[in-house]
Curated annotation (Swiss-Prot):
Subcellular location: Nucleus
Function summary: Transcriptional activator that acts as a floral inducer to promote short-day (SD) flowering pathway. Activates HD3A and other FT-like genes independently from HD1. May also activate MADS-box transcription factors involved in flowering regulation. Functions as a response regulator involved in His-to-Asp phosphorelay signal transduction system. Phosphorylation of the Asp residue in the receiver domain activates the ability of the protein to promote the transcription of target genes. May directly activate some type-A response regulators in response to cytokinins.
HTH myb-type domain boundaries: 195-254
Family listed: Belongs to the ARR family. Type-B subfamily.
Gene: EHD1
Source organism of the structure: Oryza sativa subsp. japonica
Protein name: Two-component response regulator ORR30
Signals that turn on the gene: Daily oscillation and diurnal expression in plants grown in short day (SD) but not in long day (LD) conditions.
Entry keyword Ion transport: no
Domain Response regulatory per the UniProt entry, residue ranges: 12-127
UniProt KW Isomerase keyword: no
PROSITE patterns on file: HTH_MYB (PS51294), RESPONSE_REGULATORY (PS50110)
Length: 341
């Protein structure tokens, strides 16, 4: 396959500018980026073309056409009917002008002369628009399923690294992270274990926080894997994985809390020091895992064979691998955190 058939090569861009000379310059620059270019010098001719052929236009770049409002006309027509990302360009761009176009739906505002580096990255606007549409329609899980067109991310990943431009390669990584962020709900919680993008489960800081929140909610006597799993509500996370994590969590607590109180609860030396300084303060892990443990243990019952699950070979359960959040009530800052079990 010709590498120019791979995305973002072949991106279909419609350019509108009443300055014929600059329209030719823009066409040359876009062709150098391996985009397919259609040009119009009149907005009122371009709009009917877009309305008749929305499927062959990926992005519109339009001059602002000062002092008329033609730029706003095409912006409103295109965005309201088809949601095609539109970029406005102009020779000058005061704050009020930029705000006017952005408020009316412009994805970007470019100052003339437009640099080729800016044009080589305009595909990001299409990418973000596609991801936002899927997010709004709750279709993130269907991006790669049969019956749906391949997502832009999939096409970008399919492009061999040797054929990607430097700008494309550099900009793809943060956008992949953007996609991953879209697969977490608005509260920042993980809702599907597959969204971690790992072939085997890794207990990330956020996933562990949700685990701790569930344990604290249930209390010492009722914190068993099945109930923890029910509260966490993470798709494809299994009871065995929770059981294994709970078991190793308890084992690590024993290692990190060697001193025994007269009531039978185990306290770390640090926790004891803090207790002496603030005898009325209760120390425990909150949902962010941000406090030390005091008078807290987990039940031994209902631990299944999950201790043999895949987490064991993937993660490190040594004392070096487990560091809890340290909460300084005076400084109000977090220390390091590695939840490697």
């Amino acid at each position: 396959m010709d590498h120019r058939e791979l995305w973002p090569y072949g991106l279909r861009v419609l350019v509108i500018d009443d300055d014929c000379s600059y329209l030719s310059v823009m066409e040359d620059l876009l062709l150098k980026c391996s985009y397919k270019v259609t040009t119009y010098k009149n907005v009122r001719e371009a709009v009917p073309f877009i309305l008749d052929n929305p499927q062959i236009v990926d992005l519109v770049i339009s001059d602002a056409f000062f002092p008329t409002e033609d730029g706003l006309l095409i912006l409103q027509e295109v965005t309201s009917k088809f949601g095609i990302p539109t970029v406005i360009m102009a020779s000058s761009g005061d704050t009020n002008t930029v705000m006017k176009y952005v408020a009316n739906g412009a994805f970007d505002f470019l100052l003339k002369p437009v640099r080729i580096e800016e044009l080589s990255n305009i595909w990001q606007h299409i990418f973000r628009k596609q991801m936002q549409d899927h997010k709004n329609n709750n279709m993130v899980g269907n991006l790669e399923k049969p019956g749906h067109p391949p997502s832009i991310l999939a096409m970008a990943r399919a492009t061999p690294a040797t054929t990607r431009s430097t700008a494309t390669e550099a900009s793809l990584a943060p956008l992949e992270n953007e996609v991953r962020d879209d697969m977490v709900n608005y509260n920042g919680e993980i809702t599907d274990i597959r969204d971690l993008g790992k072939s085997r489960l890794t207990w990330t800081t956020q996933l562990h926080r949700q685990f701790i929140a569930a344990v604290n909610h249930l209390g010492e006597d009722k914190a068993v894997p099945k109930k923890i799993l029910g509260i966490m509500k993470v798709k494809h996370l299994t009871r065995e994985q929770v059981a294994s994590h709970l078991q190793k969590y308890r084992m690590q607590l024993k290692k990190s809390i060697p001193t025994t109180s007269k009531h039978g609860a185990t306290l770390s030396s640090t926790a004891l020091d803090k207790t002496q300084d603030h005898p009325s303060r209760s120390q425990y892990f909150n949902q962010d895992g941000c406090k030390e443990i005091m008078d807290y243990s987990l039940p031994r019952d209902d631990l299944s064979s999950g201790s043999e699950c895949m987490l064991e070979e993937l993660n490190d359960y040594s004392s070096e691998g487990f560091q809890d959040f340290r909460w300084d009530s005076d400084k109000q800052e977090y220390g390091p955190c590695f939840w490697n079990f």
